[in-house]
Amino acid sequence: MAALIYRQLLTNSYTVELSDEIQEIGSTKTQNVTVNPGPFAQTNYAPVNWGPGETNDSTTVEPVLDGPYQPTTFNPPVSYWMLLAPTNAGVVVEGTNNTNRWLATILIEPNVQQVERTYTLFGQQVQVTVSNDSQTKWKFVDLSKQTQDGNYSQHGSLLSTPKLYGVMKHGGKIYTYNGETPNANTGYYSTTNFDTVNMTAYCDFYIIPLAQEAKCTEYINNGLPPIQNTRNIVPVSIVSRNIVYTRAQPNQDIVVSKTSLWKEMQYNRDIVIRFKFANSIIKSGGLGYKWSEVSFKPANYQYTYTRDGEEVTAHTTCSVNGVNDFNYNGGSLPTDFVISKYEVIKENSFVYIDYWDDSQAFRNMVYVRSLAADLNSVMCTGGDYSFALPVGNYPVMTGGAVSLHSAGVTLSTQFTDFVSLNSLRFRFRLSVEEPPFSILRTRVSGLYGLPAAKPNNSQEYYEIAGRFSLISLVPLNDDYQTPIMNSVTVRQDLERQLGELRDEFNNLSQQIAMSQLIDLALLPLDMFSMFSGIKSTIDAAKSMATNVMKRFKKSSLANSVSTLTDSLSDAASSISRSASVRSVSSTASAWTEVSNIASDINVTTSSISTQTSTISRRLRLKEMATQTDGMNFDDISAAVLKTKIDKSTQLNTNTLPEIVTEASEKFIPNRAYRVIKDDEVLEASIDGKYFAYKVETFEEIPFDVQKFADLVTDSPVISAIIDFKTLKNLNDNYGISRQQALNLLRSDPRVLREFINQDNPIIRNRIESLIMQCRL
């Protein structure tokens, strides 16, 4: 019979579920490892900050504090501070270009009255008069001369509690620190050939890049971090800076874990971020002396660069957040210069840069964890923008600078004119830098930040180098790709396809020939014959059947089987405990939920309709379990489904599982079932209608719900294809024999075909009404 397809789906859907569970168990197998952290470990508290774990190192990120290094003579790199950490009084550092600058620094202990001391400077004994009036602070003094035979003069003393000093070669000058901690600041000495100046350090020292000068000043004023002051920090030779380290590859694809369909990939990438700001300058109406707005706006930038010998195409979007609104009002006259609003980004602002490139890391960026990034800082300086007035000198907005420092990374989506891109959003915090900005020929001057007038300063782009690392869940087959759009969009598209397919299915109901339908309903439709009309390859058909089974196991019919199994178990235990009790609840509990509704037949007499309706909803499963020779509702449902599948033009592998499952649940919702005992028939429908009548005369008799419950448990259940009202109408108008009546009651397909071939209007109308109930 055609209903075989539903029984196959019920059986095989649980096979699919079992297979899925076995694969899941295999993929989630774990190994327990016991770690003894020792008696001093803080084992009672979880980490406060959950990080991504190890992030592979790269060449692009410099350490803030590099060292300590042993005393030595070398040529320090330009634009790097030497942070000197002497432990005793005496000569700290000396350096010369051997032309016009000899500079040395000495350290004097606290509480030293004026005294003459001998120091060895550049290999010569030199007498120097020194003093330190401070009772607690050490004193650094610079000794400088401009000729080899000249006398030393003292400059730029620094009173220091931490006993730290700094010197740097930068921009044709030698910079040092002076003043008094904790408010020390920098000064400088001009020199020629500054880049060739060799330094001799007589104490341990550190190297700090100019970009981290604020940190260097913090150390000078407040001391080194506590970990640098332990005996575990051992100075090394300066030549160790030249050791070639084995660094991570610019491109790394690492398989973290793998299952049957998915794998976790860790992607590590060296990246070059190029970005630019965009702005909007709007002029007000009038005589041309007023501007309404100078503001930032998002800017897209596409570029290529080389990574590990491979050309990478990248796309960035730069936007700002937390801007500061300024204005300038030169007066109330129509010819007075006015800017109603101009935006400035400062230390309370953020810059967002969304980055995407065409590498494998961004192909499947949907399910991502352990995202981390290390990026260098970059300084952005403002250029000159002239406000063109009709008459008079142009006001010029000039200057302004900020530094961008990495403050985090998250997932984002970039929207271009043609496509949306899953990307990474790098967040940057800002710090203001020199010079301040001003508007020439106005009173606006000495303000800090980067104004929106000309933020790129005639540069095509700013550039940041860095590295990111992430772990992404991707398909095991590299040819597959997770969808760019989110699941909601995909589901909405599927719902649209299903809606169109439902309309097509419902319209096809009128094209089904009833004689062919009866023949098709008698065929043993299995999954292969059911889906054979769909144009697809064998592999696609197998995949389609699997998808149908996976969807079908979540249907209400499959859920009813699970509930029924529990009910059978409860009924068996109930009957074994009280075998002598024969009530509706104990007898029918195997197939109904009557035990939850009523326990006494006298109390439930008024709710027979409710009881029979509840019983009828379970009789579909009872009928499947006790298959008879008669045709049932599922045979008609499956035959109609097969006919519509063959005729459909919109069916595909995505919609078929939904349609088959919906058909099993929604086709022929108004069903009636009957049981036969001798000459009596008891019939009940899902909508709560019930009848009891004689076979020969179709005379109605009182409906005995107790008897119905007993027969449902012990006798075959039959689909009332031709229901009581149709039978009675047929008998009243045409007259039928007892044998014909029994065959129609048993839903004998041969008798049904005879009536249809004879074009009996009553039977034809009944079958047509069932076909019209096969709607989605």
From Swiss-Prot:
Site (Binding to sialic acid): 101, 190
Region listing for Spike head, in residue ranges: 65-224
Biological-process GO terms, alphabetical: permeabilization of host organelle membrane involved in viral entry into host cell; virion attachment to host cell
One matching Pfam family: VP4_helical
Sequence motif YGL motif, residues: 448-450
Stretch list, region Hydrophobic: 389-409
Disulphide-bridged cysteine pairs: 203-216, 318-380
GO cellular component: host cell endoplasmic reticulum-Golgi intermediate compartment; host cell plasma membrane; host cell rough endoplasmic reticulum; host cytoskeleton; membrane; viral outer capsid
Region (Spike foot): 510-776
Stored InterPro entries: ConA-like_dom_sf (IPR013320), Rota_A_VP4 (IPR042546), Rota_VP4_MID (IPR035330), Rota_VP4_MID_sf (IPR038017), VP4_concanavalin-like (IPR000416), VP4_helical (IPR035329)
Region span, Spike body and stalk (antigen domain): 248-479
Segments forming a coiled coil: 484-518
Positions of short motif DGE motif: 308-310
Residues flagged as site, Cleavage: 231-232, 241-242, 247-248
UniProt keywords, alphabetically: Capsid protein, Coiled coil, Disulfide bond, Hemagglutinin, Host cell membrane, Host cytoplasm, Host cytoskeleton, Host endoplasmic reticulum, Host membrane, Host-virus interaction, Membrane, Outer capsid protein, Viral attachment to host cell, Viral penetration into host cytoplasm, Viral penetration via permeabilization of host membrane, Virion, Virus entry into host cell
Chain positions of motif KID motif: 644-646
Additional facts recorded: In group A rotaviruses, VP4 defines the P serotype.
Similarity field: Belongs to the rotavirus VP4 family.
Protein name: Outer capsid protein VP4
Organism: Rotavirus A (strain RVA/SA11-FEM/G3P6[1])
Lineage per the UniProt record: Viruses, Riboviria, Orthornavirae, Duplornaviricota, Resentoviricetes
